[in-house]
Each structure stands twice: as C-alpha cells, then as structure tokens.
Swiss-Prot record:
Residues 1-16 have a biased composition (Basic residues). This is Protein Rex. Changing residue 95 to A: Almost complete loss of function, no effect on Rex's phosphorylation and RNA-binding. The keyword Phosphoprotein applies. A motif (Nuclear localization signal, and RNA-binding (RxRE)) lies at residues 2-19. The RNA-binding motif binds to the RxRE, a complex secondary structure consisting of four stem loops and a long stretch of stem structure, present in incompletely spliced viral pre-mRNAs. This region also contains the NLS which mediates nuclear localization. These overlapping functions prevent Rex bound to RxRE from undesirable return to the nucleus. When Rex binds the RxRE, the NLS becomes masked while the NES remains accessible. Residues 161-170 have a biased composition (Polar residues). Homomultimer. Changing residue 24 to A: No effect on function. GO terms for biological process: mRNA transport. It comes from Human T-cell leukemia virus 2. It is found in: Host nucleus, Host nucleolus; Host cytoplasm. Keywords: Host cytoplasm, Host nucleus, mRNA transport, Phosphoprotein, RNA-binding, Transport. Rex escorts unspliced gag-pro-pol and singly spliced env mRNAs out of the nucleus of infected cells. These mRNAs carry a recognition sequence called Rex responsive element (RxRE or XRE) located at the 3' region of the long terminal repeat (LTR). This function is essential since most HTLV proteins are translated from unspliced or partially spliced pre-mRNAs that cannot exit the nucleus by the pathway used by fully processed cellular mRNAs.
Amino acid sequence: MPKTRRQRTRRARRNRPPTPWPISQDLDRASYMDTPSTCLAIVYRPIGVPSQVVYVPPAYIDMPSWPPVQSTNSPGTPSMDALSALLSNTLSLASPPSPPREPQGPSRSLPLPPLLSPPRFHLPSFNQCESTPPTEMDAWNQPSGISSPPSPSPNLASVPKTSTPPGEKP
C-alpha cells in the first residue's frame, strides 16, 4: 500500500495568535544612523494624520569636565618615571633571572603531621575527671559494682528486724 502524504495546512498570517502587547496603528518608528550610537526614536501621531517622519535629534551624553589632575607626589617621593627607570636598570637582559629558590622546609624523611586530625569521640565514662571529687549526683549515678562514698540510704545493720526467718531464734 503506497504511503500517502498529508497536505500540511498553512496558517494564514491573519490567524496568528495575538501578541502579548497591543498593536497600535498610531506608532511610527524612525531610526537615525548619523551618529556612532544608534538612537531609536518613537514618534506618536494621532490616527488619521498622514505619516510624516519627524527628525528627533539624538541625545548626546554630556561628559563632565574634570578638574586637572594635581600632582600626587609628596616632596621627597620619586616620580613614577624615576621608579620605572630604576626598575628597568636593575632588570637588564644581560643577566638571566635566577630561578626562585624553594624555601628551606623540614626534612623530607620526617612524616608531616596531618593538617586535619579526625574527630575523636570519647565514650561517656563514669570517671570523667579523676582530679575533681564526685558530686552528689555522681554518687547516685554510679553503678553498684564501683565503691562509692557512704550513701544517705539507711544502713541495714541499724534497722531492727521485725520478723525472723523460720528456723532461727530471735
């Protein structure tokens, strides 16, 4: 079965989608190229008046006139000409420039310490500071296996027994 080409329908220019800006009939644009910079002049005219190009002079940017530059050299300071002459005398092409020397650093045999050390995480320990005496809260928080100062709980030896286990005599 032979392929058939579909005819493309061309959109007429009049059926264009509307532009986002209003198209007005009362606008004439005149461009003047008589200056190095291009000036675009927009001339508005009322509808119905025959179009006539009105010359709009280009807007020249008026450069401000600066006061003459005063000498910035204080007495005793050499001028830039004297400095450049001195520099050109010291840098002559007769002697090639010496290669820059590397600064004397530490010997290469010793390993350099790392610039950044990895973070060190300390596990929480109960003996955080050996030199400081434990506070009252530290005494309560210590596990029972570690010897601790006498706690404020009553001693079992000083409490009178109210009941005796069977088999024992009071």
